[in-house]
Amino acid sequence: MSDAEEQEYEEEQPEEEEAAEEEEEAPEEPEPAAEPEEERPKPSRPVVPPLIPPKIPEGERVDFDDIHRKRMEKDLLELQTLIDVHFEQRKKEEEELVALKERIERRRAERAEQQRFRTEKERERQAKLAEEKMRKEEEEAKKRAEDDAKKKKVLSNMGAHFGGYLVKAEQKRGKRQTGREMKLRILSERKKPLNIDHMGEEQLREKAQELSDWIHQLESEKFDLMAKLKQQKYEINVLYNRISHAQKFRKGAGKGRVGGRWK
């Protein structure tokens, strides 16, 4: 209720009170004298009390517009607070998302760098191994060529001095001499010079490990060859016994070589 309406309401209230007091103070009209012959009862009129509006205390007036305005301001403030909190939370989430993307990209770059470093190290190692292998092959080929040249030179000198005697003796010895030469050639190829004067501590360890591995490999090959030789001897003996047994019981067999002698 506005101030103008309250003022109009207060002005109308005294007028209504004065009208009610005048009605109460008005004298009652004398009733006409009733005829003695016929007296009829008059209907009584109901007395309606005047409507008096409630009085508003004069100490403090209620301003509904001010209450509504304050409530609207409070709601607006709460809404603005919620909006600020929402945008602050959204900004924080966006910053966290950006930081997460940066961490992912940084980790991806680190992994790529590590992979590139490992690939480069592996390539260098493979190149070093290939170079070492090529160097060893070149040294072995050079050494074989030098040995062959020495052998040819020795044979040519011996042929010039002794003529065809060496060729005949070589033909008589046959496979045994050839096997011996093969053995000597293999030993000369495997017997490499041990140049360790220029090596450091780490290189000496690698060289010792290489020699140890080589010895283990030779022992393994030797064991395999011994087992193979033993198996071959066993098979030869079995076949020889079968041949001997067959020749003993064969009917009409002539002379044959059994047990290293003729019968």
Swiss-Prot record:
Alphabetized Pfam families for the sequence: Troponin (PF00992)
Top-level taxon: Eukaryota
Modified sites of kind Phosphoserine: 2
A GO molecular function held by the record: troponin T binding
Keywords, in A-Z order: Muscle protein, Phosphoprotein
SUPFAM superfamilies, per the entry: Troponin coil-coiled subunits (SSF90250)
Entry protein name: Troponin T, slow skeletal muscle
Gene: TNNT1
